């Protein structure tokens, strides 16, 4: 039944879901399933496999909750056959909780106290609505604990209010009305005007619950978390009350007055607060999912940024008072030299700094400069551009986001125990240019600076989603097993931290891996981990050329057949494009291997050893713009997209503050999502449309 529910929810065929769920339950990873098990899934991509896994996890949690509910009600002796059937056929978490509510163990309530005083029968009389002499009948319930008939009726109404609050239809009425017509309303907490000035837009703001944007809702929630705002849901209480009265009060009711009071009390004290909490939690989950989705996509783009490749780099972490930290890295990213120069105020040793950089560039045959884009970045760029170096030496501005986090991390201390954080930070900047993916995996994704309200969303869900993105990117690119750090190996399908460390330790003790099969000699790396990981690990220059491809070892025999059929060797087949063009994939389809896998094999042979990431392009900011004071409305400037949100994109134009291109200014057409128009790292041309110097805000447009 689980697979059928998933298929219905996702609009994916049942056989595809069944095949995917079976593999997931066997311990297969999302990258492995989507890359190497296309016959089992009907060629589902990573996003679809991930969606199935998410639904499977949710339904597994629901099943566990269902068993708890059944056990609790059965323990009370109240589990009828009909009730069991309803619970077992329920696949909605909210509905399950509504069914369970009347049986759920409760803390002491007003209704509990009334029952303990023997007022349940009186509640039945009031709800029967036939007693025209209720006060006289209530007299029978006056005791030492119940002083008057009026007190007895009040207690009975407390019981009725609780019964109404536990009625599924009543809760659905309130839920439906508040959900469809309610508005999220934020109000300022009295006396917090000055402290909460940044939330001034939300001091008295309302947005329809059904359509409130994720960034607006999360801003309200953050204001509430900081004690500045109070959030509630406005709804038509009168209409809801009328609907509840129609359900619980009969025409000609003899106890209408008391029933109306019980309905009003139930709505105000019990149902509405409960449903409001539920709806706000659902809105928070929806907003979280949207914000996490934006963050995840930004992270994916950043991790897959174009690498410079294996080139010798001089990396500079710029600064004024403390100087610029300079490191020289070889083509593998190893640190070979470091120093500090002081070209900027207050020291101003410009000529000395320039000569130092010229000497380093010549001595180490530098092929590129990587300059951090933070404080003093543009000034340092000017310095390097004025060195008069060979035109073949390229210059790149590199984001510093996360570099300081890495430099102070355990990973950095382990790698560079004898260097301080400033040297480590410069190394990270240089390596981020050489290979962004290999460097960024060492940093907590939340520190990379491409999120939207990342500190306001569910942190567990955020971490899981970002880890999935990192895993996806690492496996998409693949890693060289003989040069990969334990940090990047951790994200390879089927490995994890322990096996990654074991691989690095084995490599240190035994030298480079000669082939993929040698992985099976790594301690604790068994057949299952090998199956999941092997296709994503590359052995460059080993004794089997297929080990430097995306072809899985389980399919090597197919390539060998292709070579034999062509009357050649595997080496020749890999080297000769014309031989590969003559391959007819359908000839190699059998009961074990389908056309999707064979097609992937042929494609992998064509792309063997190629990096799927784009080529890196050089870029220069406008040389006349260094501060917000240099900007004028109407200026057209080159820029780089640094962050994408639901409401637009932030663009670095070469000054301290990034400018915002609002979604309405991204194109001369309607844009539903900024991702339709831009991606991280994209070079764009923008026009300055607004400058708020006091608040450091810059408005930009990409419209023609």
Tell what function each PLM region has:
Residues 29-30, 45-147, 337, 476-615, ...:
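Accessory alpha-helical DNA-binding modules that contact the DNA backbone or grooves
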Residues 36-38, 127, 236, 318, ...:
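Short, ordered loop/turn segments at secondary-structure junctions
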Residues 95, 396, 402, 407-477, ...:
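Long, charge-rich intrinsically disordered scaffolds of nucleic-acid metabolism proteins
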Residues 17, 338-345, 368, 408-421, ...:
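Short beta-alpha connecting loops at secondary-structure transitions
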Residues 45-51, 58, 62-315, 319-419, ...:
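Duplex nucleic acid-engaging cores and interfaces of nucleic-acid transaction enzymes
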Residues 140-149, 205-206, 244-271, 275, ...:
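Low-complexity, acidic/Ser/Thr- and charged residue-rich accessory regions of DNA metabolism proteins
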Residues 176-183, 316-320, 374-379, 398-405, ...:
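A glycine-rich phosphate-binding loop feature that marks nucleotide/adenosyl-phosphate handling sites
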